[in-house]
Amino acid sequence: MGSISYAQSTGRDVTPQRITPRISTPTAPANPFKAIQYQWKKNITATVFWIGEKPTANNPTPNHASSWDTAWQHNYGGYDNPDPSMRVNYRPKTFKPQLNPFYVALPYNDLINHRKHKPEAARVIPWWNRRLDKRHGKTSCKGRWVQIVCGKRVCYAQWEDCGPFTTNDWQYVFGNKRPKNTKNKGAGIDLSPSVRDYLGMKNMGTVHWRFIDFSRIPRGPWSYYGSNNPFVNPRLDPDRKAREDYMIYLRKLRDEAYRTKNNRQ
């Protein structure tokens, strides 16, 4: 009598089963190659401020430190003298700035302190998912670029401080409201002496401004100086890491599609 197989004795099908590997589709990050359409803030009163500015009756906040840099004046390399006779080539005459001399202040700070963001930050900041440093308590606003128009002149600068006069006006900075501030004719942006001079402004004027992605900014005097300047230090390009992450995602998506195709054959 021949031997009885395990399958015959048990009645079970022991045909080898093909194991299909589990495939998970990678989660898509924000696409950094899709331009964000930033809206213009039109007819905004602009005032001038500078690194090292001393407090006055009308402006009680000294500018040796910024909202995000407690050693702002030291890191810049000195006093950013606004006197036109003390400036050359859109920078201080007496030293080469170590930070970009083309800077602005806008009336919003995304931080509560060095450990925590404001609750609305993730909802209202357009580039939140593209920010370079995603740790808690690290600002996503410092260093972002703005485009400023005054008459026929167009200038570019980095956001490096908060003001004028308030730090919580996200409805204006990221929305469609007018500035909350009522002082200095409702000023909604502070400009550095370099920005002032390039635009041909006095110490107060009217401008249009908007945020702009770094990849769209042409070279100019705003690209010459500064360890905080991605023209000088490409590692600081705020969208560089986002582009790298997105390319990794696309490669993973390609690899998963290839494995899926092979498993079906």
What residues fall within each predicted segment?
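Bacterial N-terminal signal peptides
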Residues: 1-3
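Secreted/periplasmic proteins
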Residues: 6-265
